[in-house]
Amino acid sequence: MSDFLKDIIKETGNEYASLVSDGASGDVTDFIDTGSYIFNALLGGSIHRGLPANKITAIAGESATGKTFFVLGMCKNFLDQNPDGGVIFFESESAVTKDIIEERDIDSSRMVIMPVTTVQEFRHQALQVLDKYIAQDPADRKPLLLVLDSLGMLSTTKEIEDTQAGKETKDMTRAQIVKAAFRVLTLKLGKAKVPLVITNHTYDVVGSMFPQKEMGGGSGLKYAASSIVYLSKRKEKDGTEVIGNICLLYT
């Protein structure tokens, strides 16, 4: 039967198919320390684990909850764990600079910043990176981490064209485009065993009996991500004086 099943895999030409005993592309074989025990426990089920090394992980929250801060911490720990590894950082907010990266003691010579404006641009460039990575001999592949900061700031080709033409109509296709992007990327990431960390914005759900937050961009990321961590904050006071914010994490 084993030979028959192997023949079936060969005949179908499915590049993602394999015997379960040989390991599936979705199997988690390694974890990346996030630099935070709470984050490690939420994402990996143990304070000693962390970010699954071949999954999509989303970090969502309102402004100033530390999304980029935590992501840069993950980049640092990934590079520290993998001295021959690299990070591709897709950036849509123009917020990350060389000074910020080097102040966090991140090896800037092993990190690439790729500014992206639209969902389509991110999808195309991410696929190019993954195809190039998969084309290498498995023995020659060095550890790679992909980051998108942030999905919420990505526009679409249609939105840009409408803005340039002076149209004020809302782009109703964005959610479908986001969903299509992750339909293409999810299997590729699993096959390549490359993790993708995405930050996203949240908004308050209107009309809900109990106040709750929802991610922007439709349901595409919600279904594609293996883990979603929501960040929130509250003010820390000393008497009546506000002395800072406390960030809260929950899945």
Where are these regions (language model features)?
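The Walker A/P-loop phosphate-binding site
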Residues: 2-110, 122-131
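Amphipathic alpha-helical transducer elements in NTP-driven molecular machines
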Residues: 32-36, 40, 53, 68-69, ...
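Residue-level signature of catalytic and energy-coupling elements of molecular machines
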Residues: 39, 101, 149, 200, ...
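Conserved nucleotide-binding/hydrolysis micro-motifs of P-loop NTPases
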Residues: 93-97, 117-121, 151-154, 202-206, ...
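Phosphate-binding/switch region of NTP-binding enzymes
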Residues: 171-249
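Phosphate-binding/switch loop-helix module in NTP-utilizing enzymes
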Residues: 118-191
